[in-house]
A protein has these predicted regions:
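Flexible, processing/modification-adjacent segments and terminal tails
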Residues: 30-57, 63, 72-74, 97-180, ...
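Bacterial N-terminal signal peptides
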Residues: 8-22
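N-terminal post-signal-peptidase region of extra-cytosolic proteins
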Residues: 90-95
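Gly/Pro-enriched, hydrophobic low-complexity segments
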Residues: 120-124, 140, 144, 160-263
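N-terminal secretory signal peptides that target proteins for export/translocation
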Residues: 1-4
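Boundary at the C-terminal end of the N-terminal hydrophobic targeting segment
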Residues: 19, 26-31
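Short, conserved turn/kink motifs that form compact alpha/beta structural patches or helix kinks used as
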Residues: 79-83
């Protein structure tokens, strides 16, 4: 029963706390539009992915605050583990007490949810809202835009103080994606994501996300710096007063134990 309540709220965890910073200012269209070939747009997405890819292991603490209309805000804390080599992924909730021990495991493109109160594993889809928030598994995982979407250039816009390239992304056939259509605003100078809007196939806007803070950290496995969003703000476009804030903390890129990404390991941490 508790797992249903948690899943009814929304997405995968990473580390959120609600801040009072306003979202980026509305975009203003620029007169000139840069020219990119289809191949160059794919390379641009690969660059976005590569800047965030560790090529090794990842551990972070996440703070999440979920706000819903007419309800008291709920705060979650979770540990997030990733392994680039085989794209394995774990989210383990540590707070609140009612959700502690619940977790998600991704193995071989299958996403599983575990609830220790019933000792049962259930398979989930990429569209699953994680841990009672408005986030999805992909929000906490490595960026794979070039693998999952076909890009189209819409133009160039001013987004607050940033010059942004605006792309429309359509999901590739045969993939289980949380959102089949995505509109993306990329910082022209860094290629970091500034803003993201996600749509249903019908064209209905479902969610708007802002990425106001990015941080770089040196990766020993990659021998260069990688970037990750320290703060992400999700705004539900269907239930207008619902929002989620995620803060990513204490990132550690050292190697994790070999048997960590298993059901047995997650169950042992849930006892």
């Amino acid at each position: 029963m508790q797992s249903r309540n948690v899943l009814a709220l929304a997405l995968l965890c990473a580390g959120w706390a609600w801040l009072s910073v306003a979202p980026l200012a509305p975009a203003r269209a620029e007169t000139s539009t840069p020219s990119y070939s289809p191949a160059q747009l794919v390379e641009l997405l690969k660059k976005v992915d590569e800047r965030q890819k560790n090529q090794g292991d990842w551990r972070s603490e996440s703070y999440i605050e979920q706000k819903e209309k007419g309800k008291v805000a709920v705060v979650y804390e979770a540990l997030v583990y990733r392994r680039s080599a085989d794209q394995r992924f774990i989210i383990l909730f540590t707070k609140p007490k009612a959700s502690a021990g619940q977790g998600y495991l991704r193995v071989d493109k299958n996403l599983w949810f575990y609830d220790p109160s019933v000792g049962k594993w259930e398979r989930r889809t990429e569209r699953e809202r994680i841990g009672g928030t408005n986030s999805r598994r992909s929000d906490f995982d490595e960026s794979r835009l070039a693998e999952e979407y076909t890009p189209e250039l819409l133009g160039e816009e001013k987004l607050g103080a940033y010059n942004a390239l605006v792309l429309n992304l359509k999901g590739k056939p045969g993939l289980d994606l949380a959102f089949p259509v995505v509109k993306l605003w990329l910082d022209k100078d860094t290629t970091n994501v500034l803003k993201r809007q996600e749509f249903a196939l019908s064209g209905r806007l479902l969610r708007t996300s802002y990425y106001p803070k990015w941080k770089k950290i040196f990766s020993e496995s990659k021998k260069t710096d990688i970037w990750y969003p320290q703060e992400i703000r999700f705004y539900d476009e269907v239930e207008k007063e619902n929002s989620t804030l995620i803060l990513v903390r204490s990132v550690d890129l050292h190697a994790l134990e070999a048997n960590l990404f298993t059901k047995a390991w997650l169950e042992s941490k849930s006892r």
